[in-house]
Amino acid sequence: MEDWTQAIQNALEYVEEHLAGELEICEISRRAFLSPFYFQRIFSTLCGLGVGEYIRYRRLTLAAQELCSTDAKVIDVAAKYGYN
């Protein structure tokens, strides 16, 4: 199980570093050295969320934090995190 968690951790680090950009499951799964299909199954089992769900949740969380802590316009923050 430790190997799987490290593989998922590597992928999560990549996702966190690229949240403001475009993320593709092929590239994310490559970071875990797994096929996209198998990666999604393991990710869902270990994290309790699908990959797309996790990415949406993290982007919304970061956008909410930015809106609360800055004077940025909603439209600008939305565009920054891919909600256009």
Question: Where are these predicted regions, by residue range?
Answer:
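Basic, helix-initiating cap at the start of DNA-binding domains
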Residues: 1-6, 53
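A generic structural signal for ordered secondary structure
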Residues: 27-31
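Core residues of bacterial helix-turn-helix
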Residues: 32, 81-82
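Short coil turns linking two alpha-helices in DNA-binding domains
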Residues: 35-38, 84
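Terminal helix-turn-helix DNA-binding modules in bacterial transcription factors
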Residues: 9-26, 45-81
